[in-house]
């Protein structure tokens, strides 16, 4: 069975169509209206070997907040749906990724208990026109809607772009690891018998 999902979300602020495949080739077709987010999602898909298509229209004439947040919501919902019953998955993923001066770590538990922790400080408030605080908003909504426990640690860095890039690459790699099917796992990887 294909591990993929398509999500549509329309509000007074945004209209989003998103398709996601866990077992992809790292291909991304992205029209987000938020150039820096487009760049980060492209990295996420490439390094996680996911196929991701996003067609988003939002009130970016105000700012990028609603569009960024709502794409995070849709991607989280797509991840949850694509995982199905989670039988046979590894469940946990951990990735360290360096990007020049920056080092980021992302740790994931696909536990069905949403939680988000972020440690790190970005030296700049903006990358181009993108408000850096939206990285937190995107990741928190992603974790909430995917019902994952997501820990993001930016260990160090000087360049904000590099630091965020390391986070999104690590996110892709950690999610890829957590969603891999392990033939040794019988049923769901939990002593509770469900996730």
Curated annotation (Swiss-Prot):
The keyword S-adenosyl-L-methionine does not apply. It catalyses: D-erythro-1-(imidazol-4-yl)glycerol 3-phosphate = 3-(imidazol-4-yl)-2-oxopropyl phosphate + H2O. Its EC number is 4.2.1.19. Gene3D superfamilies: Imidazole glycerol phosphate dehydratase, domain 1 (3.30.230.40). InterPro entries: IGPD_sf, ImidazoleglycerolP_deHydtase, ImidazoleglycerP_deHydtase_CS, Ribosomal_Su5_D2-typ_SF. It holds the Pfam family IGPD. Keywords: Amino-acid biosynthesis, Cytoplasm, Histidine biosynthesis, Lyase. It is found in: Cytoplasm. Pathway: Amino-acid biosynthesis; L-histidine biosynthesis; L-histidine from 5-phospho-alpha-D-ribose 1-diphosphate: step 6/9. GO terms for biological process: L-histidine biosynthetic process. One of its GO terms (molecular function) is imidazoleglycerol-phosphate dehydratase activity. One of its GO terms (cellular component) is cytoplasm. Its main location: cytoplasm. HAMAP family: HisB (MF_00076). This is Imidazoleglycerol-phosphate dehydratase. It comes from Geobacillus thermodenitrificans (strain NG80-2). The lineage of its organism: Bacteria, Bacillati, Bacillota, Bacilli, Bacillales. The gene is hisB.
């Amino acid at each position: 069975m294909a591990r993929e999902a398509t999500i549509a979300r329309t509000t007074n602020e945004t209209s989003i169509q998103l398709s996601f495949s866990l077992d992809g080739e790292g291909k991304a077709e992205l029209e987000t209206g938020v150039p820096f987010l487009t760049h980060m999602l492209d990295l996420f898909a490439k390094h996680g070997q996911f196929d991701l298509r996003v067609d988003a229209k939002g009130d970016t004439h105000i700012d990028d907040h609603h569009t960024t947040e709502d794409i995070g919501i849709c991607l989280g919902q797509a991840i949850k749906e694509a995982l199905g019953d989670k039988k046979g998955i590894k469940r946990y993923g951990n990735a360290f990724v360096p990007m020049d001066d920056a080092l980021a770590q992302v740790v994931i538990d696909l536990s069905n208990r949403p939680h988000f922790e972020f440690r790190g400080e970005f030296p700049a408030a903006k990358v181009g026109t993108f408000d850096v605080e939206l990285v937190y908003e995107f990741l928190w909504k992603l974790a909430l809607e995917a019902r994952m426990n997501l820990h993001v640690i930016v260990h160090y860095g000087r360049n904000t772009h590099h630091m965020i890039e390391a986070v999104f690459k690590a996110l892709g790699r950690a999610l890829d690891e957590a969603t891999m099917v392990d033939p040794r796992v019988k049923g769901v990887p939990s002593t509770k018998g469900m996730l």
